[in-house]
Amino acid sequence: MKKYSILGIIILAVILGGGVFALFSALSGGPWEGVWWGVQEAGMNWSGDNIRNLETITFTRNDDKTITVDHRVQQGSKEVEGSLSGTGAIDGGRLIVTTKTGREVTFSYSRISKLIELPLKNADKTPVTVKPLTEENNNDMEEIRSEIVKISQKPENKIDTTLSSTKS
């Protein structure tokens, strides 16, 4: 009888522990809030530079339980609005976002790696991932931003938009 009592207590503890974990996960808001960042490795350009795009995503919870997604991309010396900006709804570990252009895209969260996988691809066809922006990794993000700007300002990477004219 004692064996069954101990086994019952263990099973009850496991069930309660799982319930508490699920409740905590639901109440903590999950990954869909705050600022997240990552780097898209876009490949080599014609001058041999490794081209990278700094991706920053800000998730904001709305009163109607939707999530506003603000996607920004550091492309060269300019930060532009990204193609993933829009409004999303949580679906389990995923966020289904309707972008401003009306396209539906999916963001996936991995509880193991603690990263969000974006519907963007690196040059090697692997998915682009982002991590939460913290005080500890903010300097890393800003260093990458500086490298991207510096590479874009190299003379061989400038795009000449002037038209040449020849005199006959």
Where are these regions (language model features)?
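N-terminal Sec-pathway targeting helices
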Residues: 1-16
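N-terminal glycine/threonine-rich, aromatic-flanked beta-hairpin/loop signature
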Residues: 47-92
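Edge beta-strand at a domain terminus
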Residues: 81-94, 113-115, 119-168
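Acidic, glycine-rich flexible loop segments
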Residues: 98-113
